[in-house]
Amino acid sequence: MFKAIWAARWYVLLGLFTFLLILIATTPLHFVWRFAEPAVGRLPVKIEQLGGTLWNGQLRLQVPTLRSAGVIEGQWQLSPLSLFSASPQVHLSLSGDGIRFDGDARLSADQTLTLTNTSAYLDADVLEPLLKRNRTGIKGNFELNAVSGWFNLADRGFGDVAGQLLYSGGDVSFLVDRKTVNATMPMVAGSIEMVGDKAQVNIATMEGTQLIQAYAQQDGWGGVSIRRRFLDVLGQQWPAKADEDTVIFEVSHKIL
């Protein structure tokens, strides 16, 4: 009898593997959510509704800081084999008013969220309520392509950040000496990369002329520096005599 069982060991293992897959697939989402909610709760989103199955699910969420995007609808597809590892992988698609996201995400046991093959779209109108507080306005849309990187939800560390940013161009308004200046911004492109342990975005015209540089550091501080050439692109003049590569504005702030 023992020999018969040993001879059929592969069939036993296959049956056990199949049983585990069926068990996981039929597990109610509300049961799984109890374990996932603490990690998801660290993200700046509010999950309102879940549906579907563990493999193929739907969700509705809101971003408190971007209420103008309304309720965002989402779908996910979970990789079955990744469930047997310490970091399940999911393909996530989100869509709201003027906002879209599509990419692969992996969450490991140490609460590290890794993004790959990520793209996103944002209509500038979604940012209007935030910008109005500083009497600033912008029209057009932003696109992120081929974005990847990791972010630890526990200690807020990050790394391996890379990708491309594109702004369509459009009308902008901002304050200069307490006066509102209106201008038209041309299309610009940005490269996202790691410089040491710092994430950096370099924004330039389509011809490659550098305009703006932004960064985020591991200690949670981020900043932006603007060259005088940026005002030239907007058709504005800088009152002081300065070379076009001179940084005329620089600010840093705690962002993480």
Task: Pin down the residues of each PLM region.
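Residues that define the transmembrane beta-barrel architecture of outer-membrane proteins
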Residues: 53, 68, 138, 184-188, ...
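Short helix-loop boundary/capping segments
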Residues: 153-193
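Extracytoplasmic/luminal low-complexity segments enriched in Pro/Gly and acidic/polar residues
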Residues: 194-256
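Short, hydrophobic/proline-enriched secondary-structure or compact coil segments at domain edges
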Residues: 88-92, 112-120, 163-165, 201-205, ...
